[in-house]
């Protein structure tokens, strides 16, 4: 355990950030999974709605600093490409 006061504060801050990041990443996985399930079911309308939601959540994660903008762009591109095949 740290002895320096500022390091004790950083430990608490880092833990809060870790939990927040974990929650956001979990939500991202959930919405992308929902998109893939809609795609697998062949429901184009539901897939488009899920695509829009996933894109929104990915952009939100970038703005919060959870993921890098290029990673979000790659993921959005991949799911958009999959949606275009239907």
UniProtKB/Swiss-Prot annotation:
Pfam families: Ribosomal_S20p. This is Small ribosomal subunit protein bS20. One of its GO terms (molecular function) is small ribosomal subunit rRNA binding. One of its GO terms (biological process) is translation. The keyword Transport does not apply. GO terms for cellular component: cytosol; small ribosomal subunit. InterPro entries: Ribosomal_bS20, Ribosomal_bS20_sf. Binds directly to 16S ribosomal RNA. Belongs to the bacterial ribosomal protein bS20 family. The keyword Ribosomal protein applies. The lineage of its organism: Bacteria, Bacillati, Actinomycetota, Actinomycetes, Kineosporiales. It comes from Kineococcus radiotolerans (strain ATCC BAA-149 / DSM 14245 / SRS30216). The gene is rpsT. Keywords: Ribonucleoprotein, Ribosomal protein, RNA-binding, rRNA-binding. It comes from the Bacteria. NCBIfam families: S20 (TIGR00029).
């Amino acid at each position: 355990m740290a002895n320096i006061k500022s390091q004790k504060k950083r430990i608490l801050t880092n833990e809060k950030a870790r939990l927040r990041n974990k929650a956001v990443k979990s939500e991202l996985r959930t919405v992308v999974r929902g998109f893939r399930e809609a795609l697998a079911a062949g429901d184009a309308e539901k897939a488009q709605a899920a695509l829009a939601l996933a894109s929104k959540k990915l952009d939100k994660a970038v703005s919060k600093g959870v993921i890098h903008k290029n990673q979000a762009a790659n993921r959005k591109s991949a799911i958009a490409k999959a949606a275009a095949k239907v």
